[in-house]
From Swiss-Prot:
Annotated region described as Disordered, given as residue ranges: 313-339
InterPro entries: PLC-like_Pdiesterase_TIM-brl (IPR017946)
Sequence positions that bind Mg(2+): E80, D82, D128
Entry function: Catalyzes the hydrolysis of sphingomyelin. Sphingomyelinases D are produced by some spider in their venoms, but also by arthropods such as ticks, or pathogenic bacteria and fungi. They might play a role in pathogenicity through different mechanisms, such as membrane destabilization and host cell penetration, but also pulmonary inflammation and cutaneous lesions.
The protein's name in its UniProt record: Sphingomyelinase D
Gene3D superfamilies attached to this UniProt entry: Phosphatidylinositol (PI) phosphodiesterase
Length: 339
C-alpha cells in the first residue's frame, strides 16, 4: 500500500499499463496532491429510509447539458452517460462517430454538480465506457477518474464505472479496480454466470459489484422470469437471487416496452431501471414522460416495499464476507499497480 503522492510519482516516473499499445501515465495537471476539497466524507451519507427498498430511476443516454436538465427535471435520481475518449478529450458519445459527440464530460459533470448543489437528488452517474482503454494525448482512464473525483464526488455524486464482459481483462478495468474509493463501484453488463465469474475471479468486493442485463428493447428477448434462460427477466432474477451483487439494474425501458414486462422486471427485484429513448440521446419528450409514469405507477402501487432512492441511500453499500473495499487513492492508500 502506498500513498497518493507515491502512486502519482510511480505512475509519472515508471508506471504504465498498456492501452492500445501506449502506456497510461498520470497527467501532470491537475497536480498529484488532491485539492483540499477533493472528496469529503461529509458530502456522502447513508442513512436508512423507511424500511422500503430504494429504487433508482436511471436516465438513459444523457449526452448533453440540456439532457441533464431534462432528466433531473423529470425526477431521475441517477444518470447513465455513454462515454467515448477522443484525442481532444472525453465526450458524452454513444456511437464514436465524427458527428455523434455531445458535450464534453467536463461540461456535463459541471452541470450535474451545479444541479446537485442546488438540491437535485442525483445519487450517481453511470459511465457506460465505450472505449475505456483509449489512451491518446493525455486522455485516458486516469484523467477520467480525476474529473469524476474533482467535479462529481466532491459534491456528493457517486460514480459507477460501467464495463462490458469483453472489457474486463483490459488495463483500465484493472486500474479502476485497484484505485476505486468508497464512492465508486464497477458495473459489468452481460450474462449472469459470466459476470458473476468475472467479479469473483478478479476479487471485486461484493459491495462494489453491479450487475446489469437488458436490451435496447427488452421485449425482444424478455423470456420467462421463472426459468433458467438467457432471457432478460431470468437473468435479472438470477442476479438478484444470487446475492452476489450490491445492485442489479435492467435496461432499457422505453415507451415501446410492454407495461407487463416493466412490472415483471420490478417484481423480480431490480434495484433500478434505465429508461428513455431506445436510440437517441435524452431530452424532454412525451414518450419519456409516459415511460416514467409507468415506472412510477408500479412504485406507487408498492409504496410499502419500494420508494425512490434519495441522496442518503448509498448504492454501493452491502454487507459481505467477500472482502471490503477500503477507501483508496483519495484517502491516500492504494494497491500496487500490476503492469
Amino acid at each position: 500500500m502506498v500513498s497518493l503522492l507515491r502512486l502519482c510519482s510511480f505512475l509519472l516516473a515508471a508506471g504504465s499499463i498498456l492501452v492500445q499499445g501506449s502506456p497510461i501515465i498520470a497527467p501532470s495537471i491537475p497536480p498529484c496532491e488532491p485539492p483540499s476539497n477533493f472528496t469529503g466524507p461529509s458530502n456522502f451519507t447513508s442513512r436508512p429510509g423507511n424500511g422500503a427498498s430504494p429504487f433508482w430511476l436511471i436516465a438513459h443516454r444523457v449526452l448533453t447539458k440540456d439532457g441533464v436538465k431534462a432528466a433531473l427535471g423529470h425526477g431521475a435520481n441517477a444518470l447513465e452517460m455513454d462515454i467515448t475518449g477522443w484525442w481532444s478529450g472525453w465526450f458524452g458519445d454513444h456511437d464514436g462517430l465524427l458527428t455523434s459527440a455531445g458535450d464534453t464530460v467536463s461540461d456535463l459533470f459541471d452541470e450535474i454538480a451545479s444541479r446537485r448543489t442546488q438540491g437535485d437528488p442525483v445519487s450517481f452517474v453511470w459511465l457506460d465506457l465505450k472505449n475505456p482503454d483509449f489512451n491518446k494525448n493525455g486522455v485516458n482512464i486516469v484523467s477520467l477518474m480525476i474529473l469524476c473525483r474533482e467535479k462529481l464526488e466532491k459534491v456528493g455524486v457517486r460514480v459507477l464505472y460501467g464495463f462490458y464482459s469483453s472489457q474486463t481483462n483490459g488495463p483500465s478495468f484493472k486500474f479502476v479496480k485497484q484505485v476505486m474509493n468508497e464512492n465508486e463501484a464497477i458495473g459489468i453488463d452481460g450474462k449472469f454466470e459470466t459476470v458473476e465469474k468475472d467479479f469473483e475471479e478478479k476479487g471485486i468486493p461484493l459491495q462494489k459489484r453491479v450487475f446489469s442485463s437488458g436490451l435496447f428493447n427488452p421485449d425482444f428477448n424478455f423470456g420467462n422470469c421463472e426459468v433458467h434462460s438467457s432471457g432478460v427477466c431470468a437473468q435479472l432474477r438470477e442476479g438478484k437471487e444470487s446475492h452476489e451483487f450490491s445492485k442489479v439494474f435492467g435496461w432499457t425501458v422505453s415507451s415501446y416496452t410492454r407495461k407487463d414486462h416493466v412490472y415483471k422486471m420490478m417484481e423480480v427485484g431490480v434495484d433500478g431501471l434505465i429508461y428513455g429513448f431506445v436510440a437517441s440521446h435524452y431530452y424532454d419528450h412525451a414518450d419519456i414522460r409516459h415511460t416514467l409514469s409507468t415506472i412510477r405507477g408500479w412504485l406507487e402501487e408498492h409504496k410499502d416495499t419500494h420508494r425512490l432512492a434519495t441522496v442518503d441511500d448509498n448504492p454501493w453499500s452491502s454487507m459481505s464476507k467477500k472482502g471490503s473495499s477500503k477507501s483508496s487513492w483519495v484517502k491516500g492508500e492504494v494497491p500496487s499497480i500490476a503492469h
